[in-house]
From Swiss-Prot:
Its main location: plastid. One of its GO terms (molecular function) is structural constituent of ribosome. Belongs to the universal ribosomal protein uS2 family. This is Small ribosomal subunit protein uS2c. The gene is rps2. The lineage of its organism: Eukaryota, Viridiplantae, Streptophyta, Embryophyta, Tracheophyta.
Length: 236
């Protein structure tokens, strides 16, 4: 894997609050190597470690994107949801930003059936086929469509398991992470000071509560994916 320069600036990370961890009482001792100090009851993340692992993650996604690989971005908490959908759309990635349905990856055959149902209902909705049904039947199907749109809308074009999964907030998305580990899917995870850094393939120590921090990390990863995709198109 070729190492590239991703312009990861420490001052920019500080302005985004990437270095602010959780309160010192809420910490995982395994995060000690990634913490540089304590300040006013909170842990301060060592940004040189953040820059190193973020750069490694950018190299990985660039390399994967340049070979036409598929990505899934997962971030379901309120602060991350909009950022995740925007980032994924920009980089042409799949995403889950509302709720992780248990077995979404490990029980892929069931997810595929749900996706087929969703696509069928979407076609009916577009062609106004639902309006030709009796009102009660149409109402039931519209509710089904709305439910599927909420939870599967971000993966509607996914035809198989993703090659790499990017996780925003390891604690919140633990089920998704465990499914990836079970299936051997490589993971990149944003981890705060209350997380276990040994679970994901690449763990990026960073504030997972501040919108500016999440945006900073996602922007770098998305830029690397887009650059990789451009390289793939040029070499095709």
């Amino acid at each position: 894997m070729t190492k590239r320069y991703w312009n990861i600036d420490l001052e920019e990370m500080m302005r985004a609050g990437v270095h602010f961890g959780h309160g010192t009482r809420k910490w995982n001792p395994r995060m000690a190597p990634y913490i540089s100090a304590k300040r006013k009851g909170i842990h301060i993340i060592n940004l040189t470690r953040t820059a190193r692992f973020l750069s490694e993650a950018c190299d990985l996604v660039f390399d994967a994107a340049s070979r036409g690989k598929q990505f899934l971005i997962v971030g379901t908490k309120n602060k991350a949801a909009d950022l995740v959908s925007r980032a994924a759309i920009r980089a042409r990635c799949h995403y889950v930003n509302k709720k992780w349905l248990g077995g979404m990856l490990t029980n892929w055959s069931t997810t595929e059936k749900r996706l087929h149902k969703f696509r069928d209902l979407r076609t009916e909705q577009k062609t106004e086929g639902l309006n030709r049904l009796p009102k009660r039947d149409a109402a039931v199907l519209k509710r089904q469509f709305s439910h599927l749109e909420t939870y599967l809308g971000g993966i509607k074009y996914m035809t198989g398991l993703p090659d790499i999964v990017i996780i925003i907030d390891q604690q919140e998305e633990y089920t998704a992470l465990r499914e990836c580990i079970t299936l051997g899917i490589p993971t990149i995870s944003l981890i705060d000071t209350n997380c276990n850094p040994d679970l994901a393939d690449i763990s990026i120590p960073a504030n997972d509560d501040a919108i500016a921090s999440i945006r900073f990390i996602l922007n770098k990863l998305v830029f690397a994916i887009c650059e990789g995709r451009s390289s793939y198109i040029q070499n095709s």
